[in-house]
């Protein structure tokens, strides 16, 4: 019997819990959750899976082989210290928080450590889970975590030094994409008599179809543009504007988000 604990129950924790239960990677009575606020999200889960336990970690942490910390970054170290009396070298602790590096996590415990950055698109089983394992973590624990994540996402192990940039392309990307396409839709509304609902509907289906084509036909962005934009045509005209204007926007996106990651790490470091 493999028992799994979740500490914190936001949208990512809910996605992980539901996917593990849905794919029968764990039984209801093997899942333990601690959350400070037992809100609608947790009540909905327990309505669907009444045998899930929602209790303080002190009641179950010493029985769990895998514990996922799903609290905000500035609460991770505090949570690690609460866990300390209940875990050992055989425990595998996973943090899904941005800005809390392995070195700070490892300093708080003798348990094995991994970092996972999940994506909300894994709700549709179309996301990527970024994974960084501690060098000291046993191979079988790495494999088991990767196996669990792979039932609802594509698992990609990467260098921790690349994790923040990669997170912008996976975990944050749905938000960035939504912001970009919202502005495109609103521009269409300003330049026509289309309703916002019509513009959004057209774009959502175009976005879905483009992603499907890119994956199923293994096409690059460049190939897609070549297929759509004829030389001297209308699409090419619009693409030229985007190529001229957007690089500076995205450079600023990365500059500001990477600085935010750095500030988070500095703040967490002051807690140790």
UniProtKB/Swiss-Prot annotation:
<dbReference type="Pfam" id="PF03807">
    <property type="entry name" value="F420_oxidored"/>
</dbReference>
<comment type="function">
    <text>Catalyzes the reduction of 1-pyrroline-5-carboxylate (PCA) to L-proline.</text>
</comment>
<keyword id="KW-0963">Cytoplasm</keyword>
<keyword id="KW-0560">Oxidoreductase</keyword>
<dbReference type="InterPro" id="IPR029036">
    <property type="entry name" value="P5CR_dimer"/>
</dbReference>
<dbReference type="GO" id="GO:0005737">
    <property type="term" value="C:cytoplasm"/>
</dbReference>
<dbReference type="GO" id="GO:0055129">
    <property type="term" value="P:L-proline biosynthetic process"/>
</dbReference>
<keyword id="KW-0028">Amino-acid biosynthesis</keyword>
<dbReference type="GO" id="GO:0004735">
    <property type="term" value="F:pyrroline-5-carboxylate reductase activity"/>
</dbReference>
<dbReference type="InterPro" id="IPR028939">
    <property type="entry name" value="P5C_Rdtase_cat_N"/>
</dbReference>
<dbReference type="InterPro" id="IPR000304">
    <property type="entry name" value="Pyrroline-COOH_reductase"/>
</dbReference>
<dbReference type="InterPro" id="IPR008927">
    <property type="entry name" value="6-PGluconate_DH-like_C_sf"/>
</dbReference>
<comment type="pathway">
    <text>Amino-acid biosynthesis; L-proline biosynthesis; L-proline from L-glutamate 5-semialdehyde: step 1/1.</text>
</comment>
<dbReference type="Pfam" id="PF14748">
    <property type="entry name" value="P5CR_dimer"/>
</dbReference>
<keyword id="KW-0521">NADP</keyword>
<protein>
    <recommendedName>
        <fullName>Pyrroline-5-carboxylate reductase 3</fullName>
        <ecNumber>1.5.1.2</ecNumber>
    </recommendedName>
</protein>
<keyword id="KW-0641">Proline biosynthesis</keyword>
<comment type="similarity">
    <text>Belongs to the pyrroline-5-carboxylate reductase family.</text>
</comment>
<dbReference type="InterPro" id="IPR036291">
    <property type="entry name" value="NAD(P)-bd_dom_sf"/>
</dbReference>
